Amino acid sequence: MKHLQELPLVSVIMPVYNAGDFLVPAIDSILSQTYKNFELIIVNDASTDNSATVLAEYKKKYPRLITIISLTKNRNAGGDACANIALEKARGTYIARMDADDVALPSRLEKEVAYLESHPSVFLVGSNASVINKTGNTIGDKLEPLTSSEIYQQYFTFHPLIHPTTMFRREFKGKPFSYRIKYSANNDYYTFFSLLCEGGKFANLPEKLIQYRIHGKNDTFVHMKKKFINTLRIRIEMILKKGYRPSPKAVLTTLVQGVIIITLPEAVITQLYFLSKGITKASFPSFATKPLLIVKQKVSMLG
C-alpha cells in the first residue's frame, strides 16, 4: 500500500449557503472517506442561518484539514462562483465537487481517484446517486449514462452528470480549470458542455457514490422555467460556436421539453422531473394530479 504522501492530493470544494440543517452529515461524510489524502475547502456565501457556527466548530477540530473562506456579502452568483473562489486555494491534483446538503459514501473519493489514475485521457468522472429526502429516507435514484460517447450524445437533451459526484483534473489542456460564469444559472452545464465540445472526455461510474438530497429548497428546482431558457441558450451556443451536432431525436426532445415547460405550472414540471429521474416517492401537489396523467407518457423525454 502506498504511503499517504505518495497518493494524489484531492481538493474537495464545498460551497455553502444556508445549509446549516445538513452541514454536519455532509462534512462528516467527507471526513469519513476511505481515501485520506484530501483537503476540504468550504466557501460560506454569507449564510444567514447557523452555517457559520457549524463551520467554526469543524475548523477548531480540524484546523489543518479544513479551510473556511467566509464571504461577508452574498454574491448572488450561485455555487459555481463560490467554487471558483475555492479553486484559487486548491492544491490538489484532482478536484472533487461536494454540495453542502448531500452525503458522500465512504468509498467515493477512493473509487474516483482510482478511475482517473487508470484512465489518463478522461478529464472528469462522476457516478450515479441515491436520492434522499430532508430526513434522509431514500426516495429514488439518479442514474446517468456511463461512457464518454453516451454522455456526449445525451448532453444536448439533459445534463448527464450529477454535479456533486464529479471529480476532475485540476488542469484542462494545460490551463487551470475554473467554472465559466456567463449565465444567472446553469453555469456548471455551460462549463462542462463547453469542455466536452473542446475535446474533454467524461465518464460516470455505475455505483451510487452519494446520497443526493431533495429538501424543497434545492437551487436545482427553483425557477425551472427561467433555467430552461438558460439551458436553451447554452445549447444553441454549443451548436453555433462549438460545433456540436445534435441528433434529430435530440432536437425533437428539446422541442417537447419547451412545450411542456412553457405550458405547465412550475410545480408540475418539478414533479415530472422527479418522475423522469426515477424519483417515484416524491409527493405530488393535489392540483398537479390531472396534468401529470396527461403528460406522463412524455416523462422520459424531459431528460
Residue ranges and their predicted role:
Residues 44-53, 73, 99:
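A conserved acidic beta->alpha catalytic loop
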